[in-house]
Amino acid sequence: MSLLTKAAAEAWGTYLRQRDERCEDAIRCDYGVFQFRNTVFQKTLSMLQGLYLRQYDPPALRTYVQRHQGTTVALRNPANWFLVMREQAAIPQIYARSLAADYLCCDDTLEAVGVLAVRPPDSDLTRNTKQAQELPCVLMLSHYGTVYVYDWETDGLYEVASDIKAFSKNGLLWCEYVYRHPQTPFATTEPRYHVQKFLCTDPTDAAAVAKTAREMSGLNLVIRTPGRTEVEPLLMLGSIEGLRACRPFDHMPAADFRDLLNFIRQRLCCEWYVVGLVGYYLAYGPFVPSGLVLLDKFGVVYLHKIEDSDLYRIADNFHMFLKCGLLKLRGLCRFDRGLRGECRLEELPVCHHTLKRDVLRWHGALGTITRSQLESALDWFLRPTRGTDKVPNNSSAWGRTDLLPTGALQDNQNWAFPSHSVETLPALQGGLWEDNDETTQTVDGQRCFRMPKFFPPPMCRVPYNECGVELPGGDSSDEDESGRPRRIANRIGDTPETPCNSENEDDTTVEGTSGGPEAMDSQAPYPSEDSPTTEKEAWLQRGRRAKAMHARGHTLKQVPIPEPDQMGDDGPDPGP
């Protein structure tokens, strides 16, 4: 019997500890749990009231943090996480750095209020001692009250809440680092046998994960996304042949399907593996996919969205995907330094700065909010009757959206009392924050740089850019003599690989480019490089290609995928 890897064993233990065999009605206890959640929200906000009352006064906020340095505050989602107050000068990873100018899409100022820590798990012998493990995450407040978390391990800045009230309600639900931590419970736990098979697989072995998916071909995983009550099916495929047999890919011409495989190979700069399709089922049977879930050779999980035919990173590995679901495409905002967001294939973060400034300006509150106003608002949010006079009318609010049982927060509040009694163990000081290479350099001074996309006529009759502005047509340099959009040229001498072998080479084989005219073109958008052996090498190749394409004015060619109304009753194109 083969031994499980350390990652698989930790994931398996976390999964077993979180299982609850009781029915859903018994778990949420109808009205009682909603009232209890309001109580937990009020207790969290009351512990953060010092930050709430000083969120628009940076000097007062800095003084407050210095005076309460070392104080431990219990947070939500997960409930066993804490905030340890610490001033910015005591955190070397952010000291003397301008995070707002290097990461955010708009000018702003960020003030550090402390680092995050986690209580030891139940199996830890030191759990009953007053010790907590610090994490490589810094909690920060912006000039407009927005809450951010800077993760120096992966050098990412996350927008976790629009204000402290929302942070008290949702906690760290929108912090990506939470779902990389081994103690975080899994959101996707059913069907039990399917999940167990994946948890026993090494998450960094993409071939093994794809093989497991292929063994379950035709079955569904129940994908749950934290903070959302609805579930989505993940139809397991595990092979390119299975993908070709599913709609709408079975109605794609053979040339377009080969272009799609080539596009994915070129975007990832390495070989890749099919996992399955996410979407929804119609009442009369057909499955309508919204995206293709796939892995690169390093085990990173991506989603190829059918809506815009592009790739987006959704998890660092499949175990993390079982924890966070599709959260990264449901509103999680990650800001990266320089070119790294494009190298990681992260979705472009949504800018909330202009909207919040406009809201404050419309209410006449831009730069004029006083402490007395905040005290009045706090008095209303902490009213004793909030748990009974704010009951939702819709049934969707009764779902289980907490990462841990709500009562765990009260337990950790008692454990951390008094606030200075908890000893914290320092986190690892190294991380990607120390990098200063090609991936961290800006492109023409642009913030949040992403490669522009070109939508071909079969997908969108009039192409538009990211801002909705109509692009020039006809004589555009993005089309060749035949009127077809110019594809991203392959690397010279490189034959794209597909780890999954095809039974029908006419339909699914990814054609090499060593004999084509594009491969011989000396103006290839990016130079020839060897296949990457590490994820960092793949990042460098993606960054170099993006800079070369940007310098030549090239755009990404989006392969058209048929919409349901464009598919007839005829079968797939047999190809040449």
UniProtKB/Swiss-Prot annotation:
Residue stretches of biased makeup (Basic residues): 542-555
Identify the domain of life. Viruses
Q: Cite the record's Acidic residues compositional bias ranges.
A: 566-576
Which compartments does it reside in? Virion tegument
Primary residence: virion
Region feature (Disordered): 471-576
GO CC, one annotated term: viral tegument
Q: What is this protein called?
A: Early nuclear protein HWLF1
